[in-house]
Amino acid sequence: MILSFHPLFSADRNIICAGREPGPSDLSAILEARAVILPQGCPQGLYFMARDNCPNIFPNYDVRFRYPGKIGQTRLFRENSIPHPPTKIFKNIESYRRCYQGTHAPSLPLVVKFDWGGEGDTVFLVKSYRELETCLEHAAKCENSGQRGFLIQDYIPSGNRSLRVVVIGDCFKSYWRSCADQNAFHASLSKGAAVDWSSDPGLKEMGETIVAELCHKSGINLAGMDVIFPESGSPEKPLMLEINYFFGRIGLGGSKEYYRILRKAIKRWIGSLV
């Protein structure tokens, strides 16, 4: 029996768990299932109920929950030898102050990334120490509300664009997100970037290769990953920026096309089960 908790994928049995905690009836259904299909926004409780009680689940969100946030992703990249911009992790402001005491300070320009948030909303290009202090003041305020942790990352000029590689089961789809404004920093569609499906196919293939390597090592099979290519030095060597488990669908052709790809990928995954 194939069990689906995904509202847009029909299986032998279908259950909606949105807006509630999973309970005994959900566990009973999972125990009877040969495979479980989970929603993209699957909460941790439902995920591990399925993970611990069924041998086959889609998607594989092990690293999403075991390596949470941008700090967790950096640890994941390090542990799996995935190339990424040089990064320092700070669990709070105090750890930053201990690292940079007195007149010692990080080199500029740099990128500050708070541990939470998406679509570039908590990522800042810092060109001056006044801007850096503003980011640190904001981090201190966030700590007071319970949100803590940030990264300081080398700024890698990448031609005002990034490559989004979306993995959906065994399918990889990639496209550039490019900014016409040479002064722009965020290469995200929500910040005004444009989709480019055709430029530099060789680089796109390299980007897909590094994503495929991470997927092979980690088990990720549903995510949008951001990759950049340095303008100087070794432009042919892609660097992983981050993993997005919730991602936009414009670059995939819209929601209808995304769900078409997803349903086909899930069916192939089910067909591959022994």
Regions found by a protein language model. Name each.
Residues R66-G72, F185, L252-S255:
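Short, charged, surface-exposed secondary-structure boundary motifs
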Residues R64-F150, E205, V274:
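Active-site nucleotide/adenylate-binding loops and adjacent lid/helix of ATP-dependent enzymes
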Residues I2-K91, R98:
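Conserved N-proximal alpha/beta basic substrate-recognition cap immediately N-terminal to
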Residues G41-Q44, V63-R64, F172, S178-A180, ...:
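Short glycine-enriched loops at secondary-structure junctions
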Residues L110, L151, K173, A223, ...:
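Protein kinase-like catalytic core scaffold
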